[in-house]
């Protein structure tokens, strides 16, 4: 069976990193449906962790628990612990505003706000901080530079973000997320709606962003997981089957289910 090539890890990638996010005996329910089953996983700091598996396996559900976005919807319940810097974010005592500023999220489809490019990035900052006009301008510029978009939009910050291309809109969404200076960046299939050139640019951006952020990415594209991630977790039917360094998952998986999935026998 065909195996997926994984780029050789650098010394920085193979060095042990502290744990940034950890799930402990995590279960999740959509009403009575048991969607995630006793998940235990540690996400290392300033590394890219990819979540892979067939549709409906629980990848995006796990991602949404990491910033409690599920709490916006009725009849959803998480049990267990999710620790961010050793604090349980599932505790009712953990402030939601604090969580939103520490954990950013980018979705599958670019969703720019119907406002100017500048205001798209400034919007979240205004809700969390009071900055002078000069500081806000510097903050927006820095975020757009981190989103690899500044050079393309610096002369049209007052124009509508809806006029940007799909790839530019997704990079704007990334800039908007990092503008709050989060610790963790969650990416839910961020390139699935983009063309190959835009996809390549986002992948390059992920590599650059991990210098400053802990990144968790959900992807159906195993080649993408192999290219961008340091660690990979394979999920199936709500279970975490295997989690290891990406090169190990794709070259020497310890579980037969993982082997079958990455070689295309199912999924």
Curated annotation (Swiss-Prot):
It is an enzyme of class 7 (translocase). Keywords: ATP-binding, Cell inner membrane, Cell membrane, Membrane, Nucleotide-binding, Phosphate transport, Translocase, Transport. It comes from the Bacteria. GO terms for biological process: phosphate ion transmembrane transport. One of its GO terms (molecular function) is ATPase-coupled phosphate ion transmembrane transporter activity. It is a peripheral membrane protein. It is found in: Cell inner membrane. The keyword Membrane applies. One of its GO terms (cellular component) is plasma membrane. Residues 21-262 form the ABC transporter domain. It catalyses: phosphate(out) + ATP + H2O = ADP + 2 phosphate(in) + H(+). Transmembrane segments: none annotated. Its main location: membrane. Its EC number is 7.3.2.1. ATP binds at residues 53-60. Part of the ABC transporter complex PstSACB involved in phosphate import. Responsible for energy coupling to the transport system. PANTHER family: ABC TRANSPORTER I FAMILY MEMBER 17, PHOSPHATE IMPORT ATP-BINDING PROTEIN PSTB. Belongs to the ABC transporter superfamily. Phosphate importer (TC 3.A.1.7) family. The complex is composed of two ATP-binding proteins (PstB), two transmembrane proteins (PstC and PstA) and a solute-binding protein (PstS). This is Phosphate import ATP-binding protein PstB.
